[in-house]
Amino acid sequence: MNRIGSLYFNTKFVKSKVCNSTYKAFPLIINHHTMASFQIQIISETLIKPSSPTPPSLKQHRFSDYDKTMHHMYIPAAFLYTSHGHGITSTDEVSQLLKNSLSKTLSHYYHFAGRLVGDSHVDCNDMGVKLFEVRVRCPMTEVLKRPNTDAKDLVFPKGLPWSMGEGDILVVAQITYFDCGGIAISTDMSHKIVDVSSIATFMKDWAAMARNSSHQPYPVIVSPTILPMDDIPATAEDDIMKENICQSRRFLFDDSKIVELKAMAANSGVENPTRVEVVTAILHKCAVTASTTALGSFMPNILLLAVNLRSIVSPPLANTSIGNISSCCAISVTHENQMKFPLLVGELRRSKTKLLQNYGKQLKKSELLFLNGTDKAQKLSDGDSFDCFIFTSWCRSPLYEVDFGWGRPVQVYVPSCPIKNTFRLTDTPAQDGIQALVTLEENVMPIFENDEELLAFASLIKDS
């Protein structure tokens, strides 16, 4: 039985009026795996198909060379709203609104409703996006108070976030209704077809369609030849991406502390350091310090920071371009005396400058996506063992602009990831700081979370 199907039992099949396909009406489930026991009622599982068929000329979506390097891993994001808006009196109305608007939106994102065919392409066969509806017998404040304990199991299909893809399905969504009238809308989207910017664009279009059924999305489905790559060197990617026994923690960097970090970097010669650069550097420094303490010796390492290429390439791509349109700026550290905060910020800046210079010219096959990072990883892997620290910034992406008609989300929630040495940076809801979701091996995290240098600039976000 597949992962999703194995979660449920005693099901009855009925017809969905929205998409004329079957969904399941589920019994009540009690969640005993969190600090509190919540009643979780699985209402339905539906396949939402595009409102209009995909034309024959678009029946195959071929992957770019960079897409092919991506794992079929679900990237999760959940949008939490305290109310489902004025003029809507029941969850049935919310359900119909979201299903109909999703169906219309998918007609513009035709490959999202298709099925994966190996690593080569998507069969745009309109089979649909999987949508779950769930009712949780608790107020949304329970999720907001306990992001580290309860949130993931309540707003995502169990076991799905960050997992390897569920067969050939590319997108899974869930609508969670709370007793207080709050609602969470989550998506798990395959990294084979999207990056963070693509997720934000799709969610904004779905939300706009819910507000106005005549909305016309204009996603730019990028040609597979727009970002060419030559042969990719062998790396330790499988070792980097494999799941480990890890612990995750969330840290808050207030704007005032980020200003202090930027001043420290500027005083050491880095011109106009960015908030992401300084937060990345201090997290990297403290993580390597903790790892060195746990291991008993320093290990050479590489830092990879994902960079959105849409505005960088020549000619620039539209912000609404859909696909994996990213690269990595990277720094390699071979000696412990290089692990100084100003040096790390400076190296990040130099790597980013080189990336901008490369992609600011017309793209050539000799200027390869991703290799700015993987060539350094290859050099390290040819020698001794090395660690890899992977940073992704969701900051400044328009995730908090996703408005289905009941206002901005009170929280955009990203669940913890089981892959070690991963760091995800997001804006705070009030846009007054950065939240960092950090995942490290379980013997490293206790050292990291008590690092005095880290805690001078960041506070640990605890469940209340």
Swiss-Prot record:
Domain of life (superkingdom): Eukaryota
Single GO BP term: alkaloid biosynthetic process
Catalytic activity: 17,18-epoxy-17-hydroxycur-19-ene + malonyl-CoA = prestrychnine + CoA
Compartment annotation: Cytoplasm
Tissue expression as described in the entry: Mainly expressed in roots.
Gene Ontology MF terms in the entry: acetyltransferase activity
InterPro entries, sorted: CAT-like_dom_sf
Keywords from the UniProt entry: Acyltransferase, Alkaloid metabolism, Cytoplasm, Transferase
EC number(s) per entry: 2.3.1.325
Oligomeric and partner information: Monomer.
Functional note: Malonylransferase involved in the biosynthesis of curare monoterpene indole alkaloids (MIAs), natural products such as strychnine, a neurotoxic compound used as a pesticide to control rodents, and its pharmacologically active derivatives, including brucine, used to regulate blood pressure. Curare alkaloids act as animal glycine receptor antagonists. Catalyzes the conversion of 17,18-epoxy-17-hydroxycur-19-ene (Wieland-Gumlich aldehyde) to prestrychnine, which is spontaneously converted into strychnine and isostrychnine.
Family of this protein: Belongs to the plant acyltransferase family.
Name of the protein this chain belongs to: 17,18-epoxy-17-hydroxycur-19-ene N-malonyltransferase
Organism field: Strychnos nux-vomica (Poison nut)
Gene responsible for this protein: AT
